[in-house]
Amino acid sequence: MYSNVKYVYGNHDNIKEVLNDLEIEKVDGILLDLGVSSYQLDEKSRGFSYIGNAELDMRMDQDQELTAKKVVNEYSEENLSKIIFEYGEERFARNIAKNICIYRKEKTIETTNQLVEIIEKSIPKAKQNDGHPAKRTFQAIRIEVNNEIKPLMNTVKDSIEVLNKNGRLVIITFHSLEDRAVKEAMIEAEGRCT
C-alpha cells in the first residue's frame, strides 16, 4: 500500500462528498471501477440471476426502495419497453414489455422464474440463440433498479473538477452503455477545456 493513495468504497456519483469528508480538495488521480459486484450477482437470493429461482430484487444496496419487482409490476408498458431497449439493447423490448403487462394483470410478478417465462414466450424460438433469452432484459432491469448509467455524466464532470492540473482520470467500464456514457461525458468535458 502507498501512503499517498486512499481506497474508498462508495458510490461514484458522490465523489465530491467523499473527498470533502476526507478533507481533500484536489487529487492527482482517480480510478473508477464501474463493475458490479460479482459476489452480489452470484448470490441467488438477490434476484439478479435468470438461472434458478428467487424473489425479484436486484438491488445492490438493500436499503434503497426500488426493486426489480416494483419495476416489472408498476412501470408502464411504454417505460418498460424503453428501459429494456435502451439498457438491455433488446430488440424484442416492446413484445417483452407488452407480455409483462398482460401477465401482471392476472398475477403479480414476484420471482425470477416468472419473469424468465414471460421473456422466453416474448422472443421467437428461432431468435433465442444468442445466449440466454433473459440476459438482456435482466441487465436492463438491474441497471434501472440501481441507477447505473444516468449519474455517469456527472461523475465524470465532478471527477475532472477535483483533479489537479495534469491529473489522471481512469475509468474501467464493463459494457457498451457505460462506455458510451463515459465517452459522451469526456467529449463534453473536452469542449469546456481551454
Stretches with model-predicted labels:
Residues M1-T194:
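S-adenosyl-L-methionine-dependent methyltransferase catalytic core, i.e., the SAM/SAH-binding region
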